[in-house]
């Protein structure tokens, strides 16, 4: 997938980097939220986020749960930033679909 793809997916949800605190930058200059900020964005939406390194596959798994502790979604990425950003894009898509 790659971090570029994850950032593309996040921007396609309407996410904006107006506040760049807690953000990294891609080579093309686009800002993206780093894992600590992503955790905060999940918390503000009522979800808990955990990101774990899966040594066997050398990847990261991001999983989020609702306030009841029920699994709400998960993604994998090659890096922790990729997994965090892609998880945020998927959570934003899911919550936008529910709101419609």
Region locations from a protein language model:
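N-terminal segment of the canonical double-stranded RNA-binding domain
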Residues: 2-70
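N-terminal cationic amphipathic segment used for targeting or macromolecule association
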Residues: 4, 60, 81-85, 97
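Conserved aromatic
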Residues: 32, 74-78
